[in-house]
Curated annotation (Swiss-Prot):
The keyword Glycoprotein does not apply. It catalyses: beta-D-fructose 1,6-bisphosphate + H2O = beta-D-fructose 6-phosphate + phosphate. Pathway: Carbohydrate biosynthesis; gluconeogenesis. One of its GO terms (cellular component) is cytosol. Homotetramer. Gene3D superfamilies: 3.40.190.80, Fructose-1,6-Bisphosphatase, subunit A, domain 1. Mg(2+) 2 binds at D111, D114, E276. Its EC number is 3.1.3.11. It is found in: Cytoplasm. GO terms for molecular function: fructose 1,6-bisphosphate 1-phosphatase activity; magnesium ion binding. PANTHER family: FRUCTOSE-1,6-BISPHOSPHATASE-RELATED, SEDOHEPTULOSE-1,7-BISPHOSPHATASE, CHLOROPLASTIC. Substrate binds at D114, G115, S116, S117, N204. This is Fructose-1,6-bisphosphatase class 1.
Length: 348
């Protein structure tokens, strides 16, 4: 990571367009998203003073109950994108693709409010987006039914103690932090490089009884620490907000797992390919990390429907590769014993 210079997000976007003029529309769209993010940040920052942001309403496209802040964020980002060179939007909060400007060159996939379960309790929430070129034709879904490698940019926003805007336009991943006084995002982490290996993993361990064998074995061996085949101790982290875990991995490494499991409807996990896993994968790869569905590269997956789900494993390259070894039978085997099963956590 090179030393940040405090330059603004606008400065960075200008430099990217100077480097590649074809990114002008993408840069304009990112500016619109950043402006909306500042507004959403102000609402989140007011907490209960802004009303009951956790109030439940209707169900969204995936069957989740929408909360008030979900709706607020969706409306604000849609308003922003109406002013951008965007033809179509696929949002978690809309069942179908929303058409905006006919003939515009870009399509945006967005999760307006990631981490909805954290609303109302003072924990981190965020926004995730991916930008793609429009696919010409009459099918408004076609622009999104392409591999993640077609993305021209991706990013996420973390609304926490600080508001950060994490973005890539295919030339490295950077973090900009909101200067609340000036309402400007300023560069604080330049040209991020994820360390190849680290001693942290993130997974929702409450689902252990539903995991398949490879995931159970990987986590078991992490938990055994220096007494197991990984030969070192690990810490577990889980924030219930993908953006927060992703930002932590970008800064200090580790591995994040949201696997598929044997619950009904969870064979492909819970995260959505277009507006969660593909954008995160782009950002992680641009920072020197890896992102897979456990075995195959996320960026090469092609959605067959707008709200398609995908398992997700991302982070330090050696850790992601290690997970893949468990799936294909190459995992470490030294010292595996029934002791851990007797403790109960990983018993099938």
């Amino acid at each position: 990571m090179t030393k940040p210079n405090g330059s603004s997000l606008d400065d960075h976007l200008d430099a990217e367009v100077a480097r590649d003029a074809s990114l002008a529309d993408t840069a304009a769209t990112i500016r619109a998203l950043a402006a909306a993010a500042i507004d959403v940040s102000e609402t989140v920052g007011r907490g209960a003073l802004a009303g009951d942001l956790a109030a439940q309403g209707e169900h969204n496209s995936d069957g989740d109950v929408q909360k008030a802040l979900d709706v607020i964020a969706h409306k604000r980002f849609m308003q922003a994108l109406e002013e951008a060179p965007v033809a179509q939007v696929a949002s978690e909060e809309a069942e179908d693709v929303v058409s905006l400007k006919p003939g515009a060159p870009l399509a945006v996939a967005i999760d307006p409010l990631d981490g909805s379960s954290n609303i109302g309790v003072g924990m981190v929430v965020g926004t995730i987006f991916g930008i793609r070129p429009v696919t010409l034709g009459t099918d408004v879904n076609a622009s999104f039914l392409t591999p993640g490698t077609t993305q021209t940019a991706a990013g996420f926003v973390v609304y926490g103690p600080a508001t950060t805007f994490v973005v890539t336009l295919g030339n490295g991943t950077r973090i900009f932090t909101l200067d609340r006084a000036e309402k400007v995002f300023r560069l604080t982490h330049d040209a991020l490089q994820i360390v190849p290996s680290a001693n942290e993993y993130a997974i929702n361990a409450s689902n252990v009884r539903h995991w398949d064998g490879p995931v159970k074995s990987f986590i078991e061996d992490c938990l055994r620490g220096t007494e197991g085949p990984r030969d070192r101790d690990f810490n577990m982290r889980w924030t219930a907000a993908l953006v927060a875990d992703a930002q932590r991995v970008l800064i200090r490494g580790g591995v994040f797992l949201y696997p598929g499991d044997n619950r009904k409807g969870y064979a492909q996990g819970r995260l959505r390919l277009l507006y969660e896993t593909a954008p995160i994968a782009f950002l992680i790869e641009q920072a020197g990390g890896a992102a897979t569905d456990g075995q195959a590269r996320i960026m090469e997956r092609v959605a067959t429907k707008i709200h398609e789900r995908s398992p997700l494993v991302f982070g330090s390259t050696e850790e992601v590769e290690c997970v893949a070894k468990y799936y294909d039978g190459r995992q470490p085997s030294a010292g595996r014993s029934p002791l851990f099963g007797q403790r109960g956590l990983m018993r099938s």
